[in-house]
């Protein structure tokens, strides 16, 4: 039996001043209709984490990047020994992850990121982030690694990449705010237009982040 800690989410987890456009990345303008070619996550039968994993598998198969999801640490509580040579775990608990969801290498750069999902329409709750994750991303940036967060607004079917530097700044200077406004994310992050293959083409943005390292 495996138990999740209480409160653990099973999903992942001001007006913009500028719009950003990258090669191969379409940035939607405010009020612009969504492309009919886009398909909602739910309609494809995959959740946000599965979409990212499928994208990482695609990148790996094409030799573009090596990025994997970090395993969730487990604390074993009870073990039975039905046979002398075999052990059976009968009770265990998922422990809180100490860093972020994903890490790997892209073009010689260390890449580290967290993926979160919300059903809110105008804000992203800060409670989805723990201080030890903020500290970890700060340490990655200090070593000149690439760190960011992928944020999916399920109700809007919108996905953004926000460089960790903006999350860290907002986290420590939030002035009592408990959520990150969507406007802040749109202003400082990049909107990702989902594709069929790869699902979430975030490397197009990471490539830009590498150029300004």
UniProtKB/Swiss-Prot annotation:
A Pfam family recorded for this sequence: RecU
Keyword DNA damage: yes
GO biological process: chromosome segregation; DNA recombination; DNA repair
GO molecular function, one term: endonuclease activity
Annotated Mg(2+) binding sites: 99, 101, 114, 133
Cofactor(s) listed in the protein's UniProt record: Mg(2+)
Catalytic activity: Endonucleolytic cleavage at a junction such as a reciprocal single-stranded crossover between two homologous DNA duplexes (Holliday junction)
Domain of life: Bacteria
Keywords attached to this entry: Cytoplasm, DNA damage, DNA recombination, DNA repair, Endonuclease, Hydrolase, Magnesium, Metal-binding, Nuclease
GO terms for cellular component: cytoplasm
Site, as annotated: Transition state stabilizer: 116
Family to which this protein belongs: Belongs to the RecU family.
Protein name: Holliday junction resolvase RecU
Organism: Lactococcus lactis subsp. cremoris (strain MG1363)
Classification of source organism: Bacteria, Bacillati, Bacillota, Bacilli, Lactobacillales
Gene: recU
């Amino acid at each position: 039996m495996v138990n999740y800690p209480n409160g653990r989410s099973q999903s992942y987890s001001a007006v913009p001043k500028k719009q950003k456009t990258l090669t191969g990345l379409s940035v939607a303008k405010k009020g612009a209709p969504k492309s009919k070619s886009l398909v909602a996550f739910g309609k494809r039968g995959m959740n946000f984490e599965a979409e990212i994993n499928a994208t990482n598998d695609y990148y790996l198969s094409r030799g573009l990047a090596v990025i994997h999801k970090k395993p969730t640490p487990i604390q074993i509580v009870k073990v039975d020994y039905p046979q002398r040579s075999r052990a059976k775990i009968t009770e265990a608990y998922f422990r809180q992850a100490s860093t972020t969801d994903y890490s790997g290498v892209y073009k010689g750069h260390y890449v580290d990121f967290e993926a979160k999902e919300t059903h809110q329409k105008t804000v992203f709750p800060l409670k989805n982030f723990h201080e030890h994750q903020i500290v970890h991303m700060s340490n990655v940036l200090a070593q000149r690694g690439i760190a960011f967060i992928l944020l999916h607004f399920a109700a809007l079917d919108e996905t953004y990449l926000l460089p960790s530097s903006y999350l860290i700044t907002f986290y420590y200077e939030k002035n009592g705010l408990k959520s990150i406004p969507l406007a802040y994310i749109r202003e400082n992050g990049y909107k990702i237009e989902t594709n069929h293959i790869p699902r979430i083409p975030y490397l197009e943005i990471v490539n830009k982040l590498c150029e300004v390292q």
